[in-house]
Amino acid sequence: MKGPLKIGLMDSGMGGLSVLKGILKYDAELEVVYYGDLKNSPYGEKETSEILELVRDVCKRLQEENVSAILLACNTATSAAAQTLRKEFSIPIFGMEPAIKPAILQNPGKKIALLATPVTQREKKLQRLKAELGAEELILPVSCPGLAGLVDKGEFDEAEKYLRPILKKLREENVENLVLGCTHYIFLKHIILKNFPNVRIYDGNSGTIKHLLNSLQVRQRVSNRSSVSGSVYKLILNSDEELHFRLATELLQFENKF
């Protein structure tokens, strides 16, 4: 009897857990292997060539787990490495897509702030997407160096201090729409809404997950709250710190907060 489809997820740290949580909401028979490269996090301020090498190494490690496909559950990794690695690996390599398109389509002519790492902001992938949508003048790039690292350490009070002046400036500029271009930032939605209550937040997790499941021909029935997902997962964190394993468990459990 054929077993569950086995897929790999990778991220520089904790951000991709937000994608794993989304996958687990579906009543699907999947076996997910999650690899958090905490030893080398954060990726967001590194050189593109270094990120490519790191992501390549993680994908090789995931191949050793006999996965059938890999999702780079990290916008920075996707921007820096996805195009190259798709040519190098025999299994499908999927990546993240910032939810710029739905934000633009639902708010024609309105300013859209894009919170992302410096690498994601500068890479050609994002520039091509903005050009395709004719959105160069509407997208306000907001680089957030160091913010993902605060999530990896569970320092949410520090993350709020970091975000307050950014959100204040966006309010003053009458920005009403915010795209989260980093999977780490999904875990900061509650902080963003606390400091900017009326902002509309967009992220690419849902669209990416649906694309992944469609491409792999996996059924997409969302589980009821009382039901249990058919998926199982394995966490691999290349960290010796107990904090990281404890935080990963908390991030996967606190559904209402995050």
From Swiss-Prot:
SUPFAM superfamilies: Aspartate/glutamate racemase
A single GO molecular function term of this UniProt record: glutamate racemase activity
Keyword Isomerase listed: yes
EC numbers: 5.1.1.3
Keyword Isomerase belongs to the record: yes
Active site: residue positions: 74 (proton donor/acceptor), 182 (proton donor/acceptor)
InterPro entries per UniProt: Asp/Glu/hydantoin_racemase, Asp/Glu_race, Glu_race
Pathway it works in: Cell wall biogenesis; peptidoglycan biosynthesis
Protein task: Provides the (R)-glutamate required for cell wall biosynthesis.
Family of this protein: Belongs to the aspartate/glutamate racemases family.
The protein's name in its UniProt record: Glutamate racemase
Gene: murI
